[in-house]
Regions:
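Catalytic histidine neighborhood in serine/cysteine hydrolases
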Residues: 246-263
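Short beta-strand/loop motif that positions the catalytic acidic residue
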Residues: 224-226, 230
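Short substrate-entry loop that stabilizes the transition state in hydrolases
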Residues: 53-58, 66-106, 146, 186
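Conserved alpha/beta-hydrolase "acid-adjacent" motif
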Residues: 231-240
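Primarily recognizes the serine-hydrolase "nucleophile elbow" in alpha/beta-hydrolase
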Residues: 117-190
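Mobile cap/lid helix-loop segments that gate and shape the active-site cleft of serine hydrolases
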Residues: 19-28, 157, 165, 181-214, ...
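N-terminal cap/lid segment of alpha/beta-hydrolase-fold proteins
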Residues: 16-55
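Catalytic nucleophile-loop/oxyanion-hole region of alpha/beta-hydrolase
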Residues: 35, 73-80, 94-133, 267-272
């Protein structure tokens, strides 16, 4: 039955219950894992290779969905495809929900804290999960690409690490796959729904939320993928991040995908990106010495 509710002046018609997502049979999936404090409803899905054990010490990747900071979910078709691809190739993948903006609700920096908490959660549970806590990467698309870049580029001295939970555990990652993300939120034509004011009203807030602000010579390696036909997030966003990484001497790869629009997965019709992404992750995660 449909019902109508009013939230902060918004009229919302509830949708029928969504169908249960279809997961492939050739990977193992742990559904709806609680990784945030008990008062939070957001969950994560974990993807494992079928043949693995806690002694395997596999590399891990956090997957951060897109959706303009106010939409999207951990078990959308694209996230299931990405998580399954990683698991089939010897990775443990953690696809997360995180705090989304709603109406005038200010979500920054809680959304970033959630992403960083996911990294901490993997490290804390490394023995049970069979992962190496010293080999963790992050991958995000669109708004998730922005958050993934922020996870990779910010350090404890920037004041953006969550105090709790597990404040003594590092949020750092070894590498980042940024898929058509926003590098400079002030230059993003669509108003970022996660921030309470405009760039003109709060330039320092926008600067603090921009990955470009935090590029340093010791930043982790980046793989940046962006469609040349993207009409939502201009490829210039990625080009600016590439320029900043190059200037700082940070290892990076930039793959403009000819004629690709916004919001593609690892297998857009224009080009199969799985070899590129897996090659990058293998180089910066799999081929590092395993933690003993």
């Amino acid at each position: 039955m449909l019902c109508l509710s009013l939230v902060a002046g918004w009229s919302v018609t509830a949708a029928e219950p969504a169908a249960t997502p279809a997961f492939p049979a050739d990977v193992r999936v742990e559904r709806a894992v609680a990784y945030l404090p008990t008062n939070r409803v957001e969950r994560a899905d974990l993807y494992f290779p079928l043949a693995t054990s806690p002694a395997a010490r596999l590399p891990a990747v956090v997957i951060i969905h897109g959706g303009g900071w106010n939409d999207g979910k951990r078990d959308a078709k694209r996230e299931i495809s990405t998580g399954s691809t990683l698991a089939r190739n010897g990775y443990v993948a953690m696809s997360i929900d995180y705090k989304l903006a709603w109406g005038k609700y200010v979500v920054w920096p809680t959304n970033l804290w959630d992403c960083k908490t996911a990294v901490r959660w993997l490290r804390k549970n490394a023995d049970r999960l069979g992962i190496d806590p010293n080999r963790i990467g992050v991958l995000g698309e669109s708004a998730g690409g922005h958050l993934a870049a922020m996870v990779a580029l910010t350090t404890p001295t920037d004041g953006l690490d969550p105090v709790e939970p597990d404040g003594d555990i590092s949020c750092g990652v070894n590498c980042c796959v940024d898929m058509y993300g926003i590098a400079d939120v002030a230059a993003f034509e669509q108003h970022p729904s996660m921030l309470p004011k405009t760039a003109a009203e709060a330039p320092e807030l926008y600067r603090a939320a921009a990955p470009l602000t935090y590029v340093r010579s010791n930043s982790p390696p980046f793989l940046i993928l962006h469609g040349t036909a993207d009409k939502l997030v201009s490829i210039d966003q990625s080009r600016r991040l590439v320029a900043a990484l190059e200037k700082a001497g940070v290892e990076h790869e930039f793959i403009p995908v000819p004629d690709a629009p916004h919001s593609f997965d690892l297998q857009p019709v224009q080009r199969d990106l799985r070899p590129v992404v897996l090659g990058f992750l293998d180089k910066h995660l799999r081929h590092l010495p395993a933690n003993k």
